[in-house]
Regions:
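Glycine-rich active-site/cofactor-binding loop and its immediate structural neighborhood
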Residues: 85
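C-terminal nucleotide
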Residues: 1-76, 89-128
Length: 128
C-alpha cells in the first residue's frame, strides 16, 4: 500500500515523505542519547512536513491547539489516531509540563511513558 501511495505522489510530496522517513533513525538516536528537546524539535519538523502532504492532514482546530501548545512550552508533537481528529502527542520539557497542562484544562490529558517492552496500552476499568 505504501509503495503504491508513494508512486502516486508528486515529486514535491515525495520529497516530504522521504524527509519524514529520514527522521526515524534520527529520532531513535536522539531518544537513546537523551536529547529529548532535540527530539521534540524533530517531532515539530516531521509534523510540518506531514501537513504539506495534503489539506486533510490537519484542520484549523488542530492547528490552533498545536500552535497554542508550542507557545506554552511544547517543543513539538504530532497528530495520532484515525482521520477526523484523534489526539495530539506533544513533547514538553518536564519543567514546562504543569504550565501547559493547566493552560489546556479543557482538553483531556493522558500521561504516558516510554516502555522497554515496545508499544503497550493499559486499560483501567471499574466493574460495578
Amino acid at each position: 500500500i505504501a509503495k503504491t501511495y508513494v508512486k502516486k505522489l508528486s515529486s514535491t510530496k515525495e520529497k516530504n515523505v522521504f524527509k519524514i522517513m529520514q527522521h526515524v533513525d534520527l529520532a531513535e538516536k536522539l531518544i537513546l542519547d537523551g536529547e529529548l528537546n532535540d527530539f521534540g524539535k524533530l517531532m515539530n519538523d516531521s509534523w510540518e512536513e506531514k501537513k504539506k502532504l495534503g489539506k486533510i492532514i490537519s484542520n484549523n482546530k488542530i492547528d490552533q491547539l498545536y500552535d497554542f501548545s508550542l507557545k506554552n512550552g511544547a517543543m513539538g508533537g504530532k497528530l495520532l489516531g484515525a482521520g477526523g481528529g484523534g489526539f495530539l502527542l506533544l513533547y514538553v520539557p518536564k519543567n514546562k509540563q504543569n504550565k501547559l497542562i493547566k493552560k489546556l484544562k479543557k482538553t483531556i490529558h493522558v500521561p504516558f511513558k516510554f516502555s522497554h517492552n515496545g508499544s503497550e496500552q493499559i486499560f483501567n476499568t471499574i466493574r460495578k
